[in-house]
Structures are given as structure tokens and as C-alpha cells.
Amino acid sequence: MNLDEIKNRLASLNNKGGGKKTDYAANFWKPKEGTKSQIRIVPSKFNKDFPFNELYFYFGIGKPRMLALSNFDTTDPILEFATKLRKSGDQTNMDLAKKLFPKLRVFAPVYVRGEEDKGVRFWEFGKMVYQELLGVMSDEDYGDITDVASGRDITVEVIPAKETGKMFNTTTVRVKPNQTPLAPEATTVESLLDTQKEIISLYKKYQFDEMKDILQGWLKPADEDGGKETEKVESKGKVDINAKLDNLFD
């Protein structure tokens, strides 16, 4: 009996999300609802020409999220299956495909004013904030807002949905007019640049077979008490999901 293997399996089961355990507070920054925060986007240690990282995730299939294998230019069973469903022409399958396709999330390394002791962390946001930031950074009048000597801070505000009448909170970004250094000391700047982590390393990379099993479990859920598959309701004209799975993974 291998005791280490038993302990590893127990740890895996206890980690219900199935993903890599990460100290969220140490690695990520999330703006607080109803407040304004002042931050600085820091040049990326891993790509000095572009500070943002675009990653695609599956939500609701593997809890809490799964990093898509397409981020690694690797064959992805969920993406392949979603693509086949979309091409089927059947509306039910196309609706399911929409749920399965990975969603874009963007990450930027940031230095939060007032929380300098926490160093560089990652700020995660969606397409709308991303487009706004890219629009500002493409404007030559602003210059390089990430420049460590003469860049610009950004004010981030999260407006609660109840104030806007929208379904979700609204995040606004405003670039400060003054140009300022990232930090007063050169040694601090050097440390902020050199100690950054690679964002993709903070998430578990699933293997093809792992993702296939998770997808099959999501499509054909089993009862917790007996492991019996739930009854599937057939409908005329709908492509059989089981057949699709069999054809894809044969």
C-alpha cells in the first residue's frame, strides 16, 4: 500500500473544485463594490510589449471553472464537442453549444495604491473593461500608461447594479491625468517586475481524458446515492447527445 498515493487521492477528493488550490488574496485583486480604487498596470515580466493575458475558461462544467486546453493550442474535448453541436443545425444543440463554449477573461498585473505591501497581483475583468483599456492605451495622447517612470494610474470604480438598474455591477475605469513613477525607489520597481508570477501557472491544466470525463459526467449526471444515471428525455429532431459523445471519442 502506498500511503503517499492515498493521501494524494484524499486531498484531490477534498478539493471539490478539482482545480489547483491558490491563495486568492495573495495573487489576485478584486475591486470592492461601491468604492473607488487607484491602481497601476505594471509591465508584464513575461511579455514586456503587452501587459494583458487573455485566457478562456469553462464555467459551470467543472467547479468553479476550468482552464480551456485551447489556451495551450492543444486538442480540447469540450470545445470539439461544442463545435459539433453548433454545426448540427438543431436549435436545441446550438443552445447547448452556447453554454459549452469557453468564455474570455482578461488578467492584468496591477499595483494597488494603499496596498503596496501586497506587491503585484492580477486583476481579472471581462471584454467591456478590456476594450475600454485598450482604447485608452491606443491613444497616443496618453502615452504608455504602464511606463515605470512616467506612466499613469487608473481609478477603478464598481457601481452596484441596484444603482444603475442593470442586472450586474458596472466597472468603470478612468486614467489619471498626471504622469507618475510606479514606485519612488528603483529597487522597489525592480522587485515588482521580477517577482511576478505567470498567470496561467495559477490554474490547473487538465488532461484531455480528465476533461472528457468531466464533460460526460456533466451531460449524463448520476444520482449521488446510487450512481444511477438520470433518465434522459428524448425529443424528435434532436441529435442524440450520447451518440455525439460516442462519435467524438471513438
Question: Where do the model's predicted regions map?
Answer:
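OB-fold ssDNA-binding interfaces and closely related basic DNA-contact patches used
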Residues: 1-141, 209
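Compact mixed alphabeta submodule
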Residues: 113-233
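Intrinsic-disorder/low-complexity linker and hinge segments
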Residues: 13-23, 222-243
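Short acidic, low-complexity intrinsically disordered linear motifs used
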Residues: 77-80, 234-250
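Residue-level recognition of well-ordered secondary-structure positions
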Residues: 77, 111, 152-155, 246
